[in-house]
Amino acid sequence: MSNAVALTEGQFNWIYNTLSFGLISMIACTVYTLVSQPRVLPKYRKALVLSSMVTFIAGYHYWRIFNSFHEAAGDGFSITIKGSNTAFNEAYRYVDWILTVPLLLVEAIAVLALAKEVAASLTTRLVIASALMIGLGYPGEISMDNNTKIIWGVLSTIPFLYILYVLFRELGASLERQPAGVAATVGRLRLLLIGTWGVYPISYLFPILGIEGTDAFVWRQTGYTIADILAKCVFGLTIYKIARMKSAAEGMKED
């Protein structure tokens, strides 16, 4: 495997602008969810704070990824990916995910305002499972051996399947007590989360499927960024919508 990916000028600009778009999206959503807290009842503001934390953390890491991409290019359009202290650092994404994925799940539980015991149980199990999912995937991501990638990929899939079970079976059972419209919105929220998460294993499988080189690098950076925007920004805005719906159902006046 080469130490560099030779991009065309168009591919370089595409990734550069895609990462820039990811960065500003995270910043904008952080500001919006912070200033929107007075528009929901106090008990739902924790969910908006968590949403702001998610996009703030992601924004920081996108700034680091953006700078790393620029530094890895040197004076041309070839991106150094290993063998140098200025090589493009993909690990920033994993650091981001291991922090933000558990928080995403916690904010989904927080906005539903479930009974304390139920919320605590769901939170503990989902946080542990999501951390295991990301942590177990990283050794496979950095390995050059396909068999090693497959082993760690399978191990990472186990907590992923458990998260699906909790989201669709256990959390689903609690939605019957939610106000009109909330259950349907939460249902779409779960599908959004699972749909965007599907991008990550597809990108993970690229080397195993023999999809490498320039095109794989471009599609991986594009896919990761779009998935992050959907899973963090759109997810956070949907959390805000649910908080507004529940606040209105409990008597808060629309502004």
Model-derived segments and spans:
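Hydrophobic transmembrane alpha-helical segments in integral membrane proteins
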Residues: 2-26
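C-terminal transmembrane-bundle signature of multipass membrane proteins
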Residues: 166-169, 188-255
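Internal transmembrane alpha-helix with an interfacial aromatic "cap," most often the third helix
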Residues: 30-34, 93-126, 134-142, 170
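Hydrophobic alpha-helical transmembrane segments of multi-pass membrane proteins
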Residues: 25, 47-68, 198-207
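Alpha-helical transmembrane segments in multipass membrane proteins, preferentially the mid-helix core
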Residues: 28-32, 107, 136, 159-180, ...
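Membrane-helix boundary/juxtamembrane motif in polytopic membrane proteins
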Residues: 120-125, 150, 171-195, 217
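Short aromatic-rich membrane-water interface segments that cap or initiate transmembrane helices
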Residues: 9-13, 81-98, 220-226
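Helix-loop junctions on the outward
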Residues: 59-92, 141-144
